[in-house]
Amino acid sequence: MNTELVIPKHVAIILDGNGRWAKAHKLPRNLGHKAGCEAVEQTVEDAARLGIKYLTVYGFSTENWKRSEEEVGALMQLFRFYAKRLLKIAKANNVRVKMIGERSRFSKDLVEAINRLEDETKDN
């Protein structure tokens, strides 16, 4: 029996169920989304440590824009906050970050944070 650990080159995850998780724990939805962002942070660190070359995170779909203005606003605030944190994690772990998708509906400051994240990690 071969017991050698095989590490995949590419792992893709879809962020889904944060609101249901929060509801099950009797928490507001925004805390479920925050927990999802924290899980992504940990996943980025773990993937880098394990030598996973590519990590794709599907984090926000066009359907999410149909949520309440309050929930979308909370998500955008989380994205701005975690873009800054992810920059530190990416630099510390030699990770390159590339956002794929439509940015036109994001606020100017969020787009700038994403651009900075991509630019400052492009050589990793």
What are the roles of these predicted feature ranges?
Residues M1-N124:
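Flexible, compositionally biased loop and terminal segments
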